[in-house]
C-alpha cells in the first residue's frame, strides 16, 4: 500500500517587480512652443493675432523652480557608530580620596565624637 504522506508543496516562481520608485524622465514643458513656432515661421499677420489652442495632450506641467531636483548620485551609506569607551576601565582615582586625606577625616570625626 502506498504511503499517505503529504505531497511536497510546490513553490511558485515569483516575478520581480519593476522598479517603480525611480523617476521617469519627463519631457520639459512646452505649453507655448506651438504658438511661438507657428508665429515665427509664418509671415501673415492673421496667424500671429489669433493664438493657436494649446494641445490637450501636453496637460499641466510643474514650473521648473517648483520641481523637486533629481538626485544624480546616491547618498553615502550610513557609517557605523563608534563604540563608547568604557569609563569604568579608564576611571582614575579621585584626588580627594587620597589615603592621607581619608585617614585625617576619620581621625577628625572620631575626635569630635569623643569630645561629646
From Swiss-Prot:
Residues 1-62 are annotated as: Disordered. Residues 35-56 have a biased composition (Low complexity). Disulfide bonds: none annotated. One of its GO terms (biological process) is regulation of DNA endoreduplication. The keyword Cell cycle applies. It comes from the Eukaryota. GO terms for molecular function: protein kinase inhibitor activity. InterPro entries: SMR (IPR040389). Residues 1-22 have a biased composition (Basic residues). Keywords: Cell cycle, Protein kinase inhibitor. The keyword tRNA processing does not apply. Probable cyclin-dependent protein kinase (CDK) inhibitor that functions as a repressor of mitosis in the endoreduplication cell cycle. This is Cyclin-dependent protein kinase inhibitor SMR9. It comes from Arabidopsis thaliana (Mouse-ear cress).
Amino acid at each position: 500500500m502506498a504511503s499517505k504522506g503529504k505531497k511536497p508543496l510546490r513553490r511558485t516562481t515569483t516575478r520581480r517587480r519593476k522598479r517603480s520608485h525611480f523617476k521617469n524622465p519627463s519631457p520639459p514643458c512646452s505649453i507655448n512652443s506651438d504658438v511661438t513656432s507657428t508665429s515665427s515661421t509664418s509671415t501673415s499677420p492673421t496667424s500671429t493675432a489669433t493664438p493657436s489652442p494649446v494641445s490637450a495632450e501636453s496637460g499641466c506641467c510643474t514650473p521648473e523652480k517648483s520641481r523637486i531636483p533629481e538626485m544624480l548620485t546616491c547618498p553615502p551609506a550610513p557609517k557605523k557608530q563608534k563604540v563608547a569607551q568604557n569609563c569604568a576601565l579608564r576611571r582614575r582615582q579621585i584626588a580627594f580620596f587620597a589615603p592621607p586625606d581619608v585617614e585625617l577625616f576619620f581621625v577628625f570625626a572620631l575626635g569630635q565624637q569623643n569630645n561629646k
